[in-house]
Amino acid sequence: MESKPFEVTALGRPLFPAMLYCCHWRIYFKSALFVYTTVKVTLVISGVTLWDKKSLSEDLDSHHQLLTDLKFSSSDSLSSKSSLLDVSASLKASFLGGLVEVGGSAKYLCDTKSSHQQSRVTMYYSETSRFDQLTMTKLGHIIYPQVFHQKTATHVVTAVLYGAQAFMVFDQMSSKDEKKQEIQGQLDVMVRKLPGFSIEGQGSVKMTEDEKKITENITCIFHGDFHLEQNPTTYMEALNLYKLLPTLLKENPQNAVPIKVWLYPLHLLDIKAAQLEREISTSLISNIEDIMEELGEVERTCNDLSRITMVNAFSDTEERLHSFQDSFSIYKTVLQKAVARVLPAIRGGGEKEQSLEDILKNHYSSPFNADKLNQWLHDAKSELHLLNSHTKTLEKIGIEDSDGLNTILLDPDIDVVVCLTFTSLKYEDPYLSTLKKFLTSDKFKELDGNKYELSVASDKKWFNNPDVIKTMRENLSHFRGFFLEANKDEKRISFIISAVSDPSNPGSSIYLYEKGKLTDAQFEPVSKPPLPLVKNVLEQTVSLKLQKYPSGETVQYRVEYKEVKADSGAEKGKEWLFIYTDHEDFTLTELESGKEYMIRYRVVGKVGVSEPSDTVSTRPSSAAFGRSALRTMTLNTIQVFFSNGHMVKVGNVAGSKEQTFQLKENDKIVSATLWPNHLLNRCGGLEFVIANNNSEKMSLSVKCELLGEPVRVDVKSGKCYGIKGRSGHEIDALGFYFI
């Protein structure tokens, strides 16, 4: 196979002239006593050499060979790393199989990113100092020919290029709010600028404040052949070291290490010597590299998922991820050992390349192929993101495991526990079961390449079910409103988040615990009620119509009101006063005539109270209502004014658009029509037909351009005694009461 000398990268291995080298294993032998380890066998061979020490010292040619190099790389792939170190395809295969133990600067090959959020740029510095080689005349004078009969080596080192290399690996993590591409570009610019920065007096570096701020978030990992008192860990430390690197080897030339070696085939010296029968094809090596890169991506994704708070918050999700990681780790190790087992056998002629192809086929057909691994990780990520989205708005509420929940339930100072419970986190994962089953199969243990595929049962994940998601959203809305807006200051009520397996309530449910016992597994807290209807306003009283809400059990109402001062704005002024009532029809009394009041109410359930309704504003007065006028202040505010100054308002923001309807004392409304907008989600227009004393009719209307179908209103006698509206950011409902 290799019938002529060739060169190979040292990779931090102590390779020196006259050392024996085995290309089957890609290992070297010391001239006296050496040990090498295979997958299953450990061999100890002593006293192996071709020449004595005296001959070697007399026939070694040494001369200076000075060269420096500086390169940058933004890639973390093994291919780009191998290119920087000038690693051959064959040596790369041995590294992937774990047959080569690297050292010094070559440890860079083992340094891979641990997270997808990690941006990385590498600076590579190299210099060579001298070149040593055995003279060709000495090669023919073999003093110990018995080495050829032992067949433990295939080559001998005839020349070594010495020097030193260094890799400075710069990393920067990007947060969820930062774009990784921007961080990567910023890091790349700063690393490439590093050689150009100058260090001035007292060690200060000439750079802008923005550049200094960027460097604060950059970390550095050093892999090198230089002897340092301390490795750099920051950008600034790396900058200082870079300025010193050219002097380190110059001042201490004895510290140079092998960078590259030249190997001479032993069978050219004696036909009986072992030789490299065949080499692994480049395409197969490329396939091995692709598989290992894919498994590395899987490992990074696992690391990112394990850092998500939700993983540790819920034991079921944590156990599934750990199970996946354990199975994955075992498989990756055994796969690597399988590759390591067949490589030497193929190179030595004991096996054909087909044995390696079979291992790769076995991988592609296994449940550990990249597509299946990534699909499971995608599902796991979806589940965790769903949990995170449901808890991030509830940061003030603790997430409790079963022990924490029991501790709270046993607390004598807590009467009621309201728990947002995730009910579907505990389940049997068929894919994880398949992974475990595959790892215990005979075919996996043998890894003989026979195609063996375990079927993975397809199952619909609970977190991909739209009906379940809809229910979870509703539960979250009820729970959040019940806690954040209404009852967070209630000392006797504790709000928590937990997980309890409950197939009857998939997704989530609100659990109610009273006196330490579960009393309702589908608790529906009282929700925000509709706007109160103002039925009548007199000098010191306001009559209200309160409305039940379908969500939750209504026990009482709590009517809240306060006076609004002229200079205080709508939401300011005095504190809210409140009165409890059991009746839907309720009259506020002892109000001051002529002053404006804001009124709202809450529904009181058996546990806690609801969020407050939207407010209505009214001004008690002793005079009759008289003539009225309807005014739209904006799309989300309506006011009704009466001739005596009385006013009723729906909505809360004043604006510029305005339309006024003026009615006289004896005017009668003959017909009324309302229109929704074209989207059917807002009030789009209204029209009144008015008849005066002389039976003359006129039309008063305000309409948007795009309308839906009209809705006719029964005006009965033509006298309007009430207006009802509902608003949020806009008026979305409007109605009139006629008698």
Which residues does each predicted region cover?
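Pro/Thr/Ser/Gly-rich low-complexity, intrinsically disordered linker/stalk tracts
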Residues: A521-G552, S613-F625
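Lectin-type carbohydrate-recognition ectodomains
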Residues: T135, Q556-V559, I579-Y580, E611-D614, ...
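Membrane-permeabilization and membrane-interfacing ectodomains
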Residues: M1-E357, N362, E395, D442
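Exposed aromatic-hydrophobic patches
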Residues: D585-L591, F661, V711
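Beta-strand-rich modules
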Residues: L588-V607
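Long, compositionally biased eukaryotic scaffolding/regulatory segments
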Residues: E297-R300, D304-T541, A566
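Extracellular low-complexity, O-glycosylation-prone stalks/linkers
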Residues: T541-D585, R602, V609-T615
